[in-house]
């Protein structure tokens, strides 16, 4: 089916609205005229031609303004019939029928079926070929309406339209005499490129033809025969065409030349018609990490006062010639803009001049009473900030072109509106370009669009910030900010290289310093834009852009104060009259407290008193009330939060936490209720988006700054309970998310590696009170809320964040409640709930108070095994993780003095767990990594009573084969690491027939292969560690096998620096440490028959081995690995143990191997002792 073009004034990418019903009179009129048209027969007489003319005129003049309602097939049939009645030699009738096609398809918004589309395209193409040139404009309009979104259905006509001598190619050529026809042809091409989701795209060769045509148009200057407005429309169509190719056509800009040429024309078009700016761009922009045009080093983000003053003076002169009509004329096309938003910031205005307290420079009156606002207007406006805005007197002007007249704006205003649309089109096209290329490619052009120094007016210094600060159209400013946000999104890795430096004596500016300067300049410009903007929509975009910048900038590598400036500037806007501004302000605050948390600078900001940085300003700049006016949270009786409701040692509470709590739970103030479009009628609370954002900020604080949040633990508990009692599922959900973050923060405090002093932790008895209140409140209801599975799943996650030390002290009924609910929800049909439940059970099974409960562990095992069979990969992945945890619990229970757990744990269940783990080891990597971990633990846990049973023999063999295949297969590195670790666990079980079983040689062969050749050094390390686990010589198998393992480790030591991946080098030392440990371990177990083989290896590689063992004795592992022997005494002791063992080995007379190996080890000890100044006994007491 073919979609058709909307009204010509709409952008060609805008989707068609659903047809609306015609009034009965209109419907009757259309049917009556259609019937008359169908009754006519082809006739070349003058009377017949006059009748067709009249009918066409009536059909064209019929009022279709209310939309569709006529059946699409009736419209298609009528248009086909109309074309059949008009021979191509009748130019006037052809022109009239094309007007009819254009009118009906635009106004009635019908879908032309494919056969009729084919006929109508054939007719219009023939008309272009045969009719007089004066008809081409109307024919092209009809053709544009027909091909709209139908490029893929015009395949047979594309050679005629877009071929080398195609009609559209000829008519759009720069050499064509009629500029209007040229523009209409480009419009047709743009419509051809537009595609509908789910339908085929325009074929690739034609995509490139169109792209090159559009690019040529954008690169070409305005011809002398073309007026400014037609030129703007031509540029708009070309930009829309490229945007359609990038969006719907999924065109990829793989060639640097194509991308560079496109970015060059987009940058030029971005500034098209911008007052006071006329830049010349190179034909192609080339990617470069440094500024392309000059090598200026970053300067301080401010200009001399004289520069600013001169700029202001010059602008003021131009300011006077702008008329009120002009401004209204431009405004006419900006339907979505606010009247007071068109103001600019002086490019030289420093951050200090921007007034950190939130007081800002404002335009003294809205457009219409003064001319175009300019730099000087903004700077001078500081003195007039108290003057009221006359926004209430503003009347919006219709956007229809026919409404323009000299009295309402004139041609100059109309032209400015079209120029603004070109800039907006260029920015929209740039946004599509950003989405169609990889970020690493985009960042090569960073310096072309993002400033790194205050702008000086040269072409290389203009950037997206130029538009944000200087463009008179709020919509264009918002578009520029959207593009900048898209560039900043996901830029964390790129920006992470930034580094501030105070070294000004370098001969060149390092890339890291350039990026740091760019980040500073973005902060400066965005804060300038913030204080100078009064359009709420654009203001929202500025704050969102700031939030994106804050989320990605590496503040831990930059000088302090950047976040402080953002923090102080944004504070007033959380009381703005527009709810979207308030929400985005909270989003920005959330970004500040979540970026690289915890940051010392943010920690200090959180401790600021409520009144810090707040001041009153004009009504356009919102402000916080004084501390006396702050909302206060009522004391909760049930939780006794008085002990923690305010910061200890602080005179005032954390203003951000107080703000968020009051936003969530207290009625809104009248001052903020004026434009809360999103709030429910009669609602006493802040709008939902505001409350949700406040809850997210609290969650960020709990995650990154728990030491601050913990002071409000009980009060936040009240907030969570209130949220979960509300009817809005989103509020409930975010309340539960906050609970989960608080629980995670409490757990983090009590981890063994926590650096929080015991006296600074929340006392366990208080955590018990907190969780008892949660479990006595609405949390159980949320857990059973089957109609809201997302809420249910989050409640399960929250339940898994209970501090283990507190769980054991909870009332017995609350413990039973948690366990019963989780085991019950494991049967849920919803995969989100089931995944969360599986994970929660995996957490509970590690709790010290539960892990020795055989019944609970068995029930959990059965629940997890059931989830491992689920269709959802996410459920299976969580279940496999929990199975790994459960098997960790089995291993922990082996070390307890009481053997009752092992005796009581069901052998049948153990068998079932092994079978499920084997099956899971063949699943996706997410499942497999934990399945092999579980297999290793299960095989380690097996008791002699299990191994002796015939039914276990086969499953043990299968389990080990599953591990071996995982070790050697090219799986994800995490999977192979876990498999090697699991193999080491298997080797720890003395009940298994390691050394005699057939699988022994396969297991060692797999591990030695990995330790020698695996690309990932962490996997090699784990393999070497596994090879040093067996504690008896017999477990290594035959003589040949022992020597193979020894030789493989020597080879691995020799290759320990052979890698092409730079990231692996940091693991080299740790790998050598583990290999040296394994070699010394083998020497400490070697038998007399093994020594000759070892001696042969030492003859070949003795010097290399000696140097690495000496290095091992001296420095040890550089990696953080729990299996490494770190202390010097322990490392030396390993050599002594090996030496003592070799000395005790009984060898045959004449065997020189024993003496050679002893001499090798003694030499190592001697050299080590000489270098470290120690004295060491080479022979033990048994040598006497």
Curated annotation (Swiss-Prot):
**Where does the record place its HEAT repeats?**
159-198, 455-493, 517-555, 561-598
Keywords carried by this UniProt record: Phosphoprotein, Repeat
Q: Name one Pfam family in it.
A: DUF4042
Q: Where do Acidic residues bias regions lie?
A: 332-341
PTM annotation (Phosphothreonine): residues: 621
Q: Where is this region: Disordered?
A: 292-345
Q: Which InterPro entries match?
A: ARM-like, ARM-type_fold, DUF4042, HEAT6
| Residue spans of biased composition, Polar residues class | 303-312
Question: What positions are modified (Phosphoserine)?
Answer: 402, 405, 646
Instruction: Please note every region of biased composition (Basic residues).
Output: 313-325
Q: Which domain of life is it from?
A: Eukaryota
| Protein name, as recorded | HEAT repeat-containing protein 6
Native organism is Mus musculus (Mouse)
Cite the source lineage: Eukaryota, Metazoa, Chordata, Craniata, Vertebrata
């Amino acid at each position: 089916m073919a979609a058709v073009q909307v009204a010509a004034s709409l952008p060609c990418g805008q989707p068609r609205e659903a047809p609306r019903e015609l009034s009965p009179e209109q419907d009757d009129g259309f049917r009556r005229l259609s019937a008359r048209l169908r009754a006519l027969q082809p006739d070349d007489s003058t009377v017949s031609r006059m009748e067709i003319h009249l009918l066409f005129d009536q059909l064209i003049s019929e009022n279709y303004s209310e939309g569709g309602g006529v059946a699409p097939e009736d419209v298609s049939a009528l248009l086909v019939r109309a074309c059949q009645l008009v021979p191509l030699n009748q130019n006037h009738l052809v022109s009239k029928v094309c007007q009819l096609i254009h009118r009906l398809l635009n106004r009635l918004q019908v879908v032309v079926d494919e056969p009729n589309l084919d006929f109508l395209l054939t007719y219009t193409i023939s008309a272009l070929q045969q009719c007089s040139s004066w008809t081409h404009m109307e024919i092209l309009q009809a053709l544009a309406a027909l091909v709209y979104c139908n490029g893929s259905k015009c395949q047979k006509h594309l050679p005629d339209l877009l071929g080398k001598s195609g009609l559209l190619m000829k008519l759009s050529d720069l050499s064509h005499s009629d500029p209007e026809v040229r523009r209409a042809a480009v419009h047709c091409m743009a419509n051809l490129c537009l595609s509908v989701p789910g339908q085929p795209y325009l074929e690739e060769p034609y995509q490139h033809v169109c792209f090159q045509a559009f690019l040529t148009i954008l690169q070409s200057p305005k011809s002398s025969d073309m007026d400014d407005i037609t030129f703007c429309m031509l540029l708009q169509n070309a930009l829309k065409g490229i945007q359609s190719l990038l969006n719907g056509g999924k065109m990829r800009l793989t060639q640097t030349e194509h991308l560079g040429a496109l970015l060059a024309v987009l940058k030029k078009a971005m500034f098209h018609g911008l007052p006071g700016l006329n830049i010349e761009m190179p034909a192609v922009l080339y990617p470069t990490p440094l500024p392309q045009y000059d090598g200026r080093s970053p300067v301080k983000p401010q200009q001399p006062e004289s520069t600013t003053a001169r700029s202001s003076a010059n602008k003021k002169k131009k300011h006077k010639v702008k008329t009120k009509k002009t401004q209204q004329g431009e405004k006419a096309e900006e339907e979505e803009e606010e009247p007071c938003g068109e103001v600019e910031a002086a490019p030289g205005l420093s951050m200090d001049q921007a007034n950190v307290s939130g007081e800002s420079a404002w335009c003294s009156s809205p457009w219409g009473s003064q001319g175009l606002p300019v730099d000087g207007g903004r700077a001078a406006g500081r003195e007039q900030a108290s003057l009221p805005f006359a926004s209430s007197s503003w009347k919006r002007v219709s956007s229809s072109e026919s409404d323009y007249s000299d009295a309402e704006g004139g041609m100059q205003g109309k032209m400015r509106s079209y120029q603004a649309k070109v800039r907006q089109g260029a920015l929209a096209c740039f946004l599509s370009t950003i989405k169609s290329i990889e970020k690493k490619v985009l960042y090569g052009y960073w310096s072309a669009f993002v400033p790194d120094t205050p702008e000086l007016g040269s072409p290389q210094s203009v950037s997206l910030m130029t538009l944000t600060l200087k463009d008179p159209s709020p919509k264009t400013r918002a578009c520029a900010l959207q593009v900048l946000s898209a560039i900043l999104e996901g830029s964390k890795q790129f920006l992470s290289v930034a580094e501030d430096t105070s070294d000004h004596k370098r001969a060149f500016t390092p890339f890291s310093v350039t990026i740091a300067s760019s980040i500073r300049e973005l902060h400066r410009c965005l804060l300038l834009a913030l204080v100078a903007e009064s359009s709420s929509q654009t203001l929202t975009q500025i704050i969102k852009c700031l939030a994106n910048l804050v989320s990605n900038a590496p503040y831990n590598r930059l000088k302090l104060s950047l976040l402080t400036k953002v923090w102080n500037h944004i504070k007033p806007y959380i009381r703005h009259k527009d709810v979207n501004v308030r929400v985005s302000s909270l989003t920005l605050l959330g970004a500040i407290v979540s970026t690289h948390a915890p940051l010392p600078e943010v920690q200090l900001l959180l401790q600021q008193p409520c009144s810090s940085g707040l001041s009153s300003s004009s009504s356009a700049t919102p402000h916080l009330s004084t501390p006396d006016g702050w909302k206060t949270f009522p004391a909760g009786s049930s939780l006794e939060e008085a002990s923690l409701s305010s910061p200890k040692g602080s005179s005032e509470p954390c203003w951000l936490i107080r703000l968020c709590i009051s936003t969530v739970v207290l009625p809104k103030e009248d001052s903020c209720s004026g434009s809360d479009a999103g709030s429910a009628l009669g609602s006493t609370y802040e709008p939902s988006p505001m409350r949700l954002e406040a809850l997210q900020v609290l969650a960020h604080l709990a995650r990154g700054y728990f030491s601050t949040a913990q002071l409000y633990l009980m009060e936040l508990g009240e907030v969570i309970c209130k949220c979960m009692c509300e009817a809005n599922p989103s509020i409930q959900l975010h309340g539960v998310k906050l609970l989960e973050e608080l629980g995670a923060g409490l757990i983090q405090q009590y981890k063994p590696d926590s650096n929080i002093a015991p006296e600074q932790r929340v006392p366990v008895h208080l955590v018990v009170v907190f969780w008892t209140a949660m479990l006595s409140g609405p949390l159980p209801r949320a857990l059973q809320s089957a109609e809201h599975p997302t809420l249910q799943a989050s409640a399960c996650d929250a339940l898994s964040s209970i501090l283990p030390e507190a769980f054991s002290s909870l009332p017995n009924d609350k413990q039973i409640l948690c366990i019963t609910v989780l085991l019950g929800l494991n049967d849920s049909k919803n995969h989100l709930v089931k995944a969360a439940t599986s994970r929660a059970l995996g957490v509970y099974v590690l709790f010290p108070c539960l892990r020795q409960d055989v019944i609970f562990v068995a029930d959990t095992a059965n629940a997890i095994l059931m989830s491992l069979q689920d269709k959802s990969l996410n459920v299976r992945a969580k279940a496999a993780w929990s199975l790994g945890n459960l098997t960790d619990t089995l291993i922990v229970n082996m070390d307890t003095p009481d053997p009752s757990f092992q005796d009581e744990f069901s052998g049948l269940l153990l068998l079932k767990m092994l079978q499920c783990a084997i099956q899971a080891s063949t699943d996706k990597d997410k499942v497999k990594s934990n399945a092999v971990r579980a297999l290793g633990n299960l095989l380690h846990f097996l008791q002699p009573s299990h191994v002796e049973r015939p039914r276990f023999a086969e499953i043990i063999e299968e389990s080990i084969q599953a591990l071996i295949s995982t070790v050697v297969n090219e799986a994800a590195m995490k999977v192979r690491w876990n498999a090697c670790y699991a193999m080491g666990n298997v080797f720890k079980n003395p009940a298994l027939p390691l050394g005699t079983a057939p699988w022994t040689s396969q297991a060692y062969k797999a591990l030695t292969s990995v330790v020698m050749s695996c690309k990932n050094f962490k996997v090699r390390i784990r393999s070497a560690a596994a090879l040093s686990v067996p504690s008896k010589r017999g477990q290594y198998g035959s003589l040949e096998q022992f020597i193979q393992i020894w030789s493989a480790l020597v080879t691995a030591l020799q290759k320990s620096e052979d890698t092409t991946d730079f990231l692996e080098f940091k693991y080299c030392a740790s790998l050598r440490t583990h290999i040296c440990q394994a070699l010394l371990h083998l020497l400490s177990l070697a038998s007399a028959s093994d020594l000759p083989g070892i001696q042969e290896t030492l003859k070949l590689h003795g010097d290399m081995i000696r140097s690495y063992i000496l290095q091992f004795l001296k420095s040890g592992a550089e990696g953080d690995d729990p299996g490494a022997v770190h202390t010097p005494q322990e490392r030396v002791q390993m050599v002594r143990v090996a030496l003592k063992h070799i000395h005790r080995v009984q060898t045959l007379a004449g065997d020189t191997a024993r003496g050679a190996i002893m001499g090798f080890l003694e030499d190592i000890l001697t050299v080590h002792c000489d270098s470290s100044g120690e004295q060491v006994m080479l022979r033990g007491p048994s040598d006497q």
